[in-house]
Amino acid sequence: MEIPSYASNIQPYGSQSGTKIASENDNAKSVSLSGDNSRSVSRTDKLSEHFSEQVRARQQESAETAMAQAKQRQRLNEEQLAKMVEQMNEFVKSINKGLSFRLDRESGREVVTIYEASTGDIIRQIPEEEMLEVLRRLAREQDHRSGLLMAKV
């Protein structure tokens, strides 16, 4: 913050910092308190009790608020969990797929067939049937002409 050049540091009524006025007010209060010392002590005790009651009440309120918020978070977490489970069930139902494992006798390899459970349509075979056919042909040719296959390679 920039102070303009026309600003003055002169305090009102000729005092430099206003401390003289404040100290005069403090002396007046201390004089009146020293006259009724027993009355001021009882007033202080009452104020102290009043403040401690207020502090206890606020602590009680804050504890109750914290507990209510924790219960609400727990309810939200339970609701979110239930919603997530429902979404997972819907997802699984939408992709209701079955797996079938089959061993191909000629190649000696396992073929995993993925099909739709309701219709039985084959979605994918790993390795695919075309690849198995190629492997079968290579195996047959190798049995008959193993030397020829080696010579070509």
Swiss-Prot record:
Residue spans of biased composition, Basic and acidic residues class: 42-61
Biased composition (Polar residues): 1-41
Chain residue ranges for the region called Disordered: 1-74
Stored InterPro entries: FlaG, FlaG-like_sf
NCBIfam families: PRK08868.1 (NF006465)
Family: To FlaG in other Vibrio species.
Protein name: Protein FlaG
Organism, as annotated: Vibrio cholerae serotype O1 (strain ATCC 39315 / El Tor Inaba N16961)
